[in-house]
Amino acid sequence: MSKLFNSLALLLIVLSFASCQEKKAEANVPKWILSMVSDSKNTSAEADFSNILSDKSVPYIGYIGTDYQKFSIDIQKVQRTDDNQYNVSGITVVKNNRCNFRGTIDIVENREFTHPTYGVDDSMKGQFKRRGCSIAKYNLEEETSQTGSGVFTGYLLFYWYENNDGKFVYDDIDSHSDSYCNNQYAGTWKSNKTKKSKLCAWGQYRVPNSGDLDIGAGEFSVNPKYAKNGWEK
């Protein structure tokens, strides 16, 4: 009887610890991400996400600063270095200033959606094992020798699905949806020269944590009051 009691006590301790760890992890994740993963649970995903992180199906849309100055980024290379870390490199552009950057993306959590949808007319039903997303931290350092360089830090959320062959694929199942987005980055940029920080975010189709910048219903559309900040065509 005492062995059974001890086993139950140990199980409760383990479950309590796991619950505390999950709550602690969630406490560090930005609210904008938590709101997008509410219908999901922790999962394991032994996969190389390089193909998703380097996706170029559409260019990134981004901003920097409280005036929502247009920010462009081209992620040119992504290479997995261990189970949860990726080396990345590319180019950023703000106004006429270009910088090269290198850095890392570290996956902190993989999640599986508990009530996945199946696309238009359920066309993807039976075509995948599960749909999910990954939460990651990023640290991207622009070359210090270049004018206007700095360091980007923040969180990233990207979506995937595992097909019936066990391959993890860029999730565009809901691309017909007005709110569809993928590869969402949001955080800050800190100037190497002044050490001052600015908000900075970018993503595919939509931009996370962007206040009233995007007023589009069916697709991204810039608020006219910010058009002069690099958004005019």
Where are these regions (language model features)?
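Tryptophan-anchored aromatic micro-motifs
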Residues: 25-74, 88-92, 122-144, 148, ...
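Mid-length scaffold segments of soluble, non-membrane domains
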Residues: 85, 92-106, 113-116, 128
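Short beta-strand elements
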Residues: 201-213
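Short linear interaction motifs
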Residues: 82-88, 165-170
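C-terminal motif of bacterial Sec signal peptides marking the signal peptidase cleavage site
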Residues: 16-19
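Short beta-strand micro-motifs enriched in acidic
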Residues: 76-78, 104-108
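Exposed beta-sheet edge/beta-hairpin loop segments within beta-rich domains
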Residues: 173-179
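Bacterial N-terminal signal peptides that target proteins for export
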Residues: 1-8
